[in-house]
């Protein structure tokens, strides 16, 4: 019975995520990161991931030509924010932000598993809301809270 309850919450979470992503204007359904982190989610929910350091650098070195290509790619992506791995952002991510004119997101999604001190559902809903709100969508916090409570009750 516990497993069935967990499955129901996870199915509800999947539907909720799709609804939140749908509030983001289609051109802005892109997550600009340093490294490939959200590939699975991007494919499942129909947004693009632009891992700029993975796509444009070799060995982590940011050359002037790479910075120019990254800036152009970000500008044309439609993204309203760059999502660094952590805050404060690295010097490289700050340079990319300045060069592209696209700001660093004020909040950072947790890209590696479950956030410390948070449940799986709290991590997922927080990450989705950070992305959706930064990209011009509207996140349904009330339903996110209900999902978190349902998960905690299992």
Regions from the language model: what does each represent?
Residues 1-154:
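Extracytoplasmic metal-acquisition and chelation regions
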